[in-house]
């Protein structure tokens, strides 16, 4: 069973809004109480929240489907439905959210950072909210909108100050275990490290984190070996350290060629974040070189031989042995100083304020195009939303939809394009036979659907009239 997962594809479905209620107020001595249907509750959204106690995306590996609660339906007596609860999902710090096309949606850094992955649908209006001066007793209500549904890719990019890179079996895991309390798996065969290992290193009053990235080989930036899957974990590292095995017996390898090969792979790799968080490109990050395994006599000689050549590149060079712990303290304090210098030299990242992007107010645009089969297709945010809100089992609701489309100008545009009575018109997922409200060329008269003529009448039978009527019925019965 995998213990560390740093890339998953998940399926999110926010809650749908509740349906509005169509009801009439019923109360003693109030025969015409009017509409009192409540609105439906909004659907729950799916929100990612950064939790420092979460370190992997393993939970999403086994449960990739996330569904939020839907809103409750409205009820009579002007009672609105309850809103669906938001589904808050905990993710590790450093999680990057990508859409289906690979576009970056969010870079979640910092405890408590939130991102709305899928928005809940709006609740439908009840007939009380639909009542107006000309529509005093609507016999229908609007349906709730569907919640947002989409597939997302989550990638975890480790947050560490120092990233250790090197060929397999260079001693990176041994170095992490020697300078920190981390206990990574260590063995004498290549690719022992299959997941990044993090360790916290203390340097006097300061502390920093070190990430051990699985071994790289030539072509890692193009997907060879394990490098492409784990190179993303060094994107956030402030300092990159080349760990070189000076005791290797492989032909054609030496410290200089190993460093050049690693630099080639780093130069070919394109980070997803593109210098976000003010870290800059990988090529601009400070470097250090660790010549490892100098406890072997031949390795010590080789390290001393190439040390000056590497130092000419302007990189600090440390000759260490994780087996005997030789020169580990100079390495620890040297890396701590490099991190401090780099952080002091780079510009201070200005905290980004949360950006609220409201739903566009002007969504009245629409297009009408022939479908090639004698029908027409109407596209537009507002008409498609109205279709989803309409209960087609209610004739009055369908009439209300026709009025809304006519006011928007859809009927006029269909007539202009030569639409005839009975032709197929598709809006969203609904296809129906179109019937114009008025003949072509005549103005569209907006009817007050949902009106009740009894509400406009003041003719009510009083107590005296009812008493007289009872007397007449008695007399008629006696006769």
UniProtKB/Swiss-Prot annotation:
UniProt: Mg(2+) binding residues: 173, 193
PTM section of the record: Autophosphorylates using GTP but not ATP; autophosphorylation requires Mg(2+), is inhibited by cold GTP and to a lesser extent GDP but not by ATP.
Effect on the protein upon substituting residue 212 to A: No GTPase activity
Pfam family, one: GTP1_OBG
E.C. code: 3.6.5.-
Cell division as UniProt keyword: no
EC class (word): hydrolase
OCT domain residues: 358-436
UniProtKB keywords: Cell membrane, Cytoplasm, GTP-binding, Hydrolase, Magnesium, Membrane, Metal-binding, Nucleotide-binding, Phosphoprotein
Signal peptide positions (record): none
Region feature (Disordered): 434-479
MF (Gene Ontology): GTP binding; GTPase activity; magnesium ion binding
Induction and repression of expression: Expression increases about 5-fold from early log phase to stationary phase, dropping in late stationary phase (at protein level).
Segments forming domain Obg: 2-159
Keyword Ubl conjugation appears in the UniProt entry: no
Role according to the record: An essential GTPase which binds GTP, GDP and possibly (p)ppGpp with moderate affinity, with high nucleotide exchange rates and a fairly low GTP hydrolysis rate. Plays a role in control of the cell cycle, stress response, ribosome biogenesis and in those bacteria that undergo differentiation, in morphogenesis control. GTPase activity is not inhibited by ATP or GDP. Overexpression decreases cell growth starting in late log phase and continuing into stationary phase.
Protein family: Belongs to the TRAFAC class OBG-HflX-like GTPase superfamily. OBG GTPase family.
Protein name, UniProt field: GTPase Obg
Species name: Mycobacterium tuberculosis (strain ATCC 25618 / H37Rv)
The organism's taxonomic lineage, starting at the top: Bacteria, Bacillati, Actinomycetota, Actinomycetes, Mycobacteriales
Name of the encoding gene: obg
